[in-house]
Every structure is written in structure tokens, then in C-alpha cells.
A protein has these predicted regions:
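Glycine-rich phosphate-binding loop and adjoining helix at the ATP-binding site
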Residues: 54, 82-129
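N-terminal glycine/serine-rich phosphate-binding loop of ATP-dependent small-molecule kinases
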Residues: 1-92, 119-120
């Protein structure tokens, strides 16, 4: 029995194939570029993430019986924005967690609402990305 782990990170998609004892039996990494269209901005194409998964999973399973995969777990970078249209198509590059274009708005929220109050209301901190 095997389990697949997929990590859609900021710089790459990392895939692991783990056996039932928890040992890593195969791993694959597909890097994708960061886009910096303006100073302080940080974006990526969500299509690159999907391509990395679609390409990476068959590579990960090469030489292994896919029928023995019992589960898949995935995780990814947090605090990003993927804008979709009404048909769920991506309409622009994703704005990443490390994008700084809204730092003035974050400062405003922290000053007017307060960091602690904002965190208690949203269960999160205000983030520029």
C-alpha cells in the first residue's frame, strides 16, 4: 500500500510516494517560475501548478502499481488569491502570499481595527499578499 503527498509550494511542486511503514519510496519535484511584474509584486500561473501535478504524478508512480495507492494528501502555499470567472476559469496570475502590493491597506486595518481584534475576528493576521 502507498500514499501520495503533494506539496504545491512557492517555488516547486514536490511529490512523495510513501509506503505503509512511512518510508519515502520515490519523490519528484517540478519547479515553476515566480513572476514579478512590478516591484513588490509576486505572482504565479495556477496553470503551472496543475501542469506540475499532472506531469509529476505519473512520474512518481513509474515502476509502482498505481492500484496500490490508498490515499492522496495535498497542501499548498497559503494566503494566495486565484481569481476565477463564472465558469471557474483562471482569469489572471495568482497573487501570492509574499506579494506586497496591499501593505498600505494592511497598515490601515491594523491601525484602525487593531492587530489583536482583527486576528480574533478573522482567525488570521492581515497579510499584504
Amino acid at each position: 500500500m502507498y500514499f501520495i503527498g503533494i506539496d504545491l509550494g512557492t517555488s516547486a511542486c514536490k511529490l512523495l510516494l510513501v509506503d505503509e511503514a512511512g518510508a519515502i519510496v520515490n519523490e519528484v519535484t517540478h519547479e515553476y517560475p515566480l513572476i514579478f511584474p512590478h516591484p513588490g509584486w509576486s505572482e504565479q500561473k495556477p496553470e503551472d501548478w496543475w501542469s506540475a501535478v499532472v506531469t509529476g504524478v505519473p512520474e512518481l508512480l513509474r515502476g509502482f502499481d498505481a492500484e496500490l495507492v490508498a490515499g492522496i494528501g495535498s497542501g499548498g502555499q497559503m494566503h494566495g488569491l486565484v481569481a476565477l470567472d463564472a465558469a471557474d476559469n483562471v482569469i489572471r496570475p495568482a497573487i501570492l502570499w509574499n506579494d506586497g502590493r496591499t501593505s498600505k491597506e494592511v497598515d490601515y486595518l491594523n491601525n484602525v481595527v487593531g492587530k489583536d481584534k482583527l486576528s480574533s475576528l478573522t482567525a488570521n493576521i492581515a497579510f499584504a499578499g
